[in-house]
Amino acid sequence: MKTTETKKREIADQLIQSMKTAGTGFMLPWVQSGMPTNLGRLGTKNPYYYGINNLILWREKNYSKYKSNVWGTFKQIKDKGGMVNKGESAIDVVLWRPFEVTDTYKRNTSSHKKGDTYQKSCFFITFFKVFNMDQTTLKDKYAPNQNIEGAKSKVDVETYISNTKAEIQHGFDKCYYVPSKDFIAMADKSDFKATVESNATQNYYSTLLHELTHWTGHKSRCDRDLQGYFGDDSYAFEELVAEIGAAVQCCILGVTSTPKKESAQYLNSWIKRIEKDPDALFKATAKASQAVKFVEG
């Protein structure tokens, strides 16, 4: 049986290979295939997969040319009256299990003394196996473009963005988030051009969703490290978080995304960091998911 570390390395290696092959567009064909949904979460508030499971299932769907966006365990499929087709293989996805550990305070404060103990919540990774509905007798029931119960209908992009209450200023020659003043600087919508992947309007929104992901990193929101400088590891890591977060939001909203030109400058940093430490990929996707959930409210 493969260990957790071996499986994490395999997942990281698959993404690295995609980065090396497709460059900054490594997520494009996956994202355009739609949000992966969970057969076992019918009727829940949010039936979507998030985090690293997005990348795992996006890549697998594209690689195996599946048409359905719905995935389920053997038991979930059986409970829905279906069966897995003979000879089909499952894919591992990640489950984060919480546990508590005892830690000690490192300094005195008004509420506790140095050395006092407290309980801290942590998580460990386990894996479980899922099948795409194309691999089962439920294929026709969960055909392409058929969302399962509980999946969100497409939301108007402007409404989605305005609901965040983020301060967005237009008229700039570049697009970026300013943590010290907590606003997003955007070029005018008319300044955006069409590309092979998407039209000008979609490029505007995919860029804005990238910057909106950065906006969630403010200390009053998801509190990520936004103090990095261009070229260093922390800066490149935050860009990976924003790239994944924007891709997920584009997928949810039905926006065809185009990678930022600047992403090419971070690509080698992403590859080197993930090659050195597969956990960096898991951390980036977890933080991107936290950002998306914050924006969704």
What does each of the following model-derived ranges do?
Residues 1-297:
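N-terminal accessory/interface modules of nucleic-acid-binding and processing proteins
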